[in-house]
Amino acid sequence: AAACLEFDPQKANLAYAGADIYLMPSKSEPCGLSQIIAMRFGTVPVVNATGGLKDTVWPYDPSSEQGRGFTFQSYNADDFLAAIDRSLQLFYDEPEKWARLSEADMSIDSSWKLPAQEYMELYKKAIG
C-alpha cells in the first residue's frame, strides 16, 4: 500500500463531488474554505457552529427548508453525532428535500462581488 502525501486539486474535487455529506467538526475555524467548496459541489456540510463555519453554514430547518447544512453547538462527540443523525435522517427519509438542499448549496454565490460592493459602499460613506 502507498500513501499519497501531496495535494492534488483534481482528486480533491472528485472527493467533494462524490460525497453526500462533508464532516467538519473543527474546534475553532477562523474562516474555512472547504465547507464552501463542499457546498459548491452539492455536498451538504455537518459542522461545529464556530467562527467562519457559523457564518457560512446556517442550520437547516426541514419544515421551512431554510439553511445550508447541519450544525452542532457544543464541541463534543454526542452533539456531533446528533448533527450527523439529523443529516442522515433527511438523506434517507426525505430524499427530495435533501436534493433541494444540495441544489441550493450549489447555487451559493461565494465570489467576492457582493462583499466588494458592500465594502465600497462603506468606504464611500466613511469619506462622505
Residue ranges and their predicted role:
Residues 1-11:
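Nucleotide-activated donor-binding/catalytic signature segment of Leloir-type glycosyltransferases, i.e.
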Residues 9, 14-107:
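Catalytic binding pocket for nucleotide-activated donors in carbohydrate/polymer assembly enzymes
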Residues 112-128:
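C-terminal alpha-helical cap of glycosyltransferases
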